[in-house]
């Protein structure tokens, strides 16, 4: 029965050669697309593992983030939160290595299009001193060069925006955060883990040229720009000893059971002192 049906199908397709060719082409495209995507996924996974690693060439991606979405802690508050998390650490096989405060603010980049007109581009500015966690990535490549921002009027510009807008080291740009706009000298070109996929927040599409910017100042540089006190922060970056598993949203299993339990404990500890901060691991990073 099956043999007869197969023969009839073959005769029918042979009578319509164009349809047969189309079917074969669709099958071939599907097979080659699957192979190509599998190779890309493997390559991308390996590349990101190397970037995120706690090595000399990596950036040491945090294991846990504590984010204050509605406000900014002053320096004393940020330090006390790290101390609170350390002293309230639960019994766990996961060991705290570092807790670093970080300031990240929405802002703008001012571009002079001609002598009479200027353009404001939405931006995100990071206050990053040379810490231990989530460092600026500046590989030895044509894409990147220079050094980290040290002075409070220096900035490392993201390589995506530098390449798109033909901005180079030594150039001066005008940026804002809050109510002020100030000039900063570009001393480096690099990348950051938050913006390896360069898109505006909330969008799944890559940002078009001239529509979004990111840059990495010193902590004092961003505090100066936003008129904030020394040590201000709205993120806590927590690094654990080793590389614990974390839950993958693409599966139904809970891969990082110990990390999930630790996050619940940290969240409960923070909520006990009436904080609105949110706590998440790498699975919660978009």
Where are these regions (language model features)?
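Membrane transport/envelope proteins' first extracytoplasmic loop
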Residues: 2-286
């Amino acid at each position: 029965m099956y043999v007869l049906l197969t023969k009839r199908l073959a005769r029918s397709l042979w009578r319509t050669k164009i349809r047969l060719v189309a079917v074969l082409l669709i099958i071939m495209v599907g097979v080659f697309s699957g192979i190509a995507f599998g190779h890309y996924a493997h390559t991308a996974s390996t590349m990101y593992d190397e970037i995120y690693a706690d090595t000399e060439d990596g950036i040491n991606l945090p294991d846990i983030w504590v984010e204050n979405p509605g406000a900014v802690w002053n320096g004393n508050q940020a330090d006390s939160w790290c101390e609170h998390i350390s002293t309230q650490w639960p019994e766990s096989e996961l060991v705290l290595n570092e807790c670093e405060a970080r300031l990240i603010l929405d802002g703008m980049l001012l571009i002079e299009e001609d002598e009479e007109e200027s353009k404001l581009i939405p931006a995100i500015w990071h206050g990053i001193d040379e810490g231990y966690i989530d460092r600026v990535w500046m590989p030895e490549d044509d894409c990147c060069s220079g050094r980290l921002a040290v002075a409070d009027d220096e900035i490392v510009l993201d390589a995506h925006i530098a390449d798109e807008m033909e901005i180079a080291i030594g150039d001066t740009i005008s940026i804002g955060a809050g109510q002020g706009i100030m000039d900063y000298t570009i001393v480096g070109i690099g990348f950051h883990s938050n913006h390896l996929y360069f898109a505006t927040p909330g969008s799944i599409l890559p940002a078009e040229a001239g529509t979004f910017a990111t840059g990495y100042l010193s902590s004092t540089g961003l505090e100066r720009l936003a008129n904030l006190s020394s040590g201000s922060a709205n993120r806590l970056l927590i690094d654990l000893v080793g590389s614990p598993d974390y839950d993958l949203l693409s599966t139904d299993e809970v891969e990082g059971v110990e990390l999930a339990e630790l996050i619940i404990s940290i969240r409960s500890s923070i909520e006990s002192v009436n904080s609105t901060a949110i706590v998440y691991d790498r699975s919660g990073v978009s």
